[in-house]
Amino acid sequence: HPEVNWQWHHLPLSMHEPAATAGARLAECAGETGGHATFWQAVAWLYAHTRGDGQGLPEGLRYPDLTPAMQGCLDSDRPDAVIRAQAAEAAQQGIAATPALQLRDRESGKTLLLHGPVEGDALLSAIDLLAAGSTTAAEPAHSPDMPAGVAGDMPR
């Protein structure tokens, strides 16, 4: 979608610690030292190799593209400050679980929060809803054919 900038915000959940913060630190340091493409490469690698239920990476497995600059970042407090700030922002916005997508229209300032995994069509519909400048994004229209309880708060 041409009007979209994708931003990742870390939200390590306590049930996935310490692996969640370790992964977030690696991704942050990859981005700090190598830019956006390196950040996303690290995120993809982490998702491909991380075990579920907060177990993290298998014992002895190391990020293959670790550079001295990345190691210097990992040895510092810099990634922790970014992760803490992003987690605090999420808490302030009422986001307490992952995945969550917050869509923000840069022109109008309107936001739409989608909880849980979001299918591609639903994401595109939500983006289109914000891009259309609809004033009813927060209040779905109701008709006699669709009772209020059925509409919910998800974009359709």
Question: Language-model features: where?
Answer:
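C-terminal cap of thioredoxin/glutaredoxin-like
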Residues: 59-156
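Structural alpha/beta surface segment adjacent to cysteine/selenocysteine redox centers
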Residues: 1-64, 96, 128, 133, ...
